[in-house]
Structures are given as structure tokens and as C-alpha cells.
Amino acid sequence: FTGFSRQRQIESARVATEDARHRRRAEELRMRAEIQAAYRAVQAALETVRIEAANRDLADEQLRLETERYRVGSSTFLELSEAATIKARADRAYLDAIYGFHESIAALEAAVGIRLRQENGGDS
């Protein structure tokens, strides 16, 4: 009589199937969460680029104004130098933001498993 053995095998197969379903569902949820987090990071990085671009433009305008003030003698070299330093920092922050944006796009591409950016037509 193999009734109990057969019943145990059936139950074991059912449990294994259910476990596989749960593992698959857990993996789907993990992947979905990873993709959502990567997408939110891209959105945040894009907003950072916009903010840093505006800051860079303001610093550029401030340097232009300070240069003109220095030219007509109503500003000191120290003030001009400070405006140039602020402009350089704003340029650097903008470049860092651009780099961060591309990093976040690469992370999103890795999460979804496909390339999201188009090729530029170059040799790369």
C-alpha cells in the first residue's frame, strides 16, 4: 500500500509549487520597487539639473554685472573675484548634476533591463 507515500508526494509537490509562486511574486515586487526607486531618482536628478542650470545662469549674470561694475570703478577686485568663484562653483554644481542625471538613467536602464537612451550616431 503506497497511499500515504503518494499523498505525501502530492502534498510536497503542491507546497513546492506554492513556494515557487511566492518566490516569483516576491521577485516581481522587488523588481517593481527597484524600478520605481530608480525612476524617482531620475526625476529628482532631472529637477536638480534644472535648479543647477538656473543657479548657473544667475551666477553668470552676477559675474557679468560685477565685471561691468569693476570696469567702471564701482567694485573692487575682491568682489569681482568672489563673483568669479561663485560662477565656477555654479558651473561645477551643474556638471555634477548632469553627471548624476546620467548615473540615474543608467541605474534605471539596469533596473528595467533595456537601453532607454538613443545612440548619438557616434562610434560608441
Regions flagged by a language model, labelled:
Residues 54-114:
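Short segments within alpha-helical structural elements
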Residues 47-50, 107-108, 114-116, 120:
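Short leucine-rich amphipathic alpha-helices used at interfaces
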Residues 1-61, 96-99:
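Sec/SRP-type N-terminal targeting helices
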Residues 7, 77, 117:
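Short, electropositive, low-hydrophobicity segments enriched in small/polar residues
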